[in-house]
Design a protein with these regions (language model features):
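Extracellular/secretory pathway and lumenal proteins
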Residues: 84, 137-139, 200
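Short, surface-exposed beta-strand/loop "edge" segments at domain boundaries and coil↔beta transitions
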Residues: 116-120, 140-150, 190-195, 205, ...
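N-terminal secretory signal peptides
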Residues: 47-53, 65-128, 185, 223
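Long, charged/polar, surface-exposed segments that mediate recognition or autoinhibition
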Residues: 117-184
Length: 223
């Protein structure tokens, strides 16, 4: 959303009038006819159009440094990206300050989200054999997805290579409503993608009375 300065043009034209020249003659000689008046001067050329002012450079967006969006993108950067490139899941999660826990009988690593509620957290799951995909489970304040999505938008923009937005929609369902935002860089030979899926009841209310839930997936693939 850029604005360009518009320059105004003011044309000024002037006409110069010349006095008729007269010559004096000998008294005995007939007077010479008066010289015709000088032709009117040509109007001055209008000034050249001013060049438009240079557009101000748009500042690069920056990732937030606090809030849930900052926590989530920090896990993406420090855990997910190096993990799909072959990094060790346990070592990366531990180095990012995540704590070992169990969920549904499986070992996971968790990191608190903001709000001071123990149920608000990011959960990193063991990738198992599918090491090209990093899967995060998010439990956050009810209706608290907006700052997370804003942060993911910036993260995808700053990602190298840039990942443009691909989806922002939902699929109606009788059991769980899935609202999807996705970003992807792809060529004929590779894909780097980010998918954020909110999980809600069909009427849009939370699945859990205490928090909202979402799944966040990051992947890198070659073909």
């Amino acid at each position: 959303m850029r604005t360009a300065a518009i320059a105004s043009l003011i044309a000024v034209a002037g006409l110069a009038s010349a006095a008729a020249a007269q010559t004096t003659a000998d008294p005995a000689a007939p007077a010479a006819p008066a010289a015709p008046p000088a032709a009117d001067a040509a109007p001055a050329a209008p000034p050249a159009e001013a060049a438009p002012a240079a557009e101000a450079a748009k500042p690069e967006p920056t990732l937030p440094t606090d809030g849930d969006g900052a926590v989530v993108t920090n896990v993406l950067t420090k855990v997910c990206v190096p993990m799909v490139k072959g990094g060790d899941y346990v070592s990366l999660a531990t180095a990012a300050g995540m704590k070992k826990a169990k969920k549904d009988g499986n070992v996971v690593y968790t990191l608190p989200l903001t709000g001071g509620v123990k149920d608000y957290m990011v959960i990193v799951e063991n990738p198992g054999s599918n090491k090209q995909v990093c899967s995060l489970k998010l439990q956050y304040a009810i209706d608290g997805e907006k700052p997370i999505i804003r942060s993911l938008n910036i993260w995808a923009y700053l990602h190298d290579p840039y990942m443009p937005a691909q989806r922002n929609d939902y699929v109606p369902a009788t059991d769980v409503k899935r609202i999807t935002n996705s970003w992807e860089y792809f060529t004929d030979h590779e894909s780097q993608g980010l998918v954020f899926v909110q999980l809600k009841k069909p009427d849009g209310t939370p699945l859990n009375a205490k928090y909202d839930q979402a799944t966040l997936l990051y992947s890198e693939r070659t073909f």
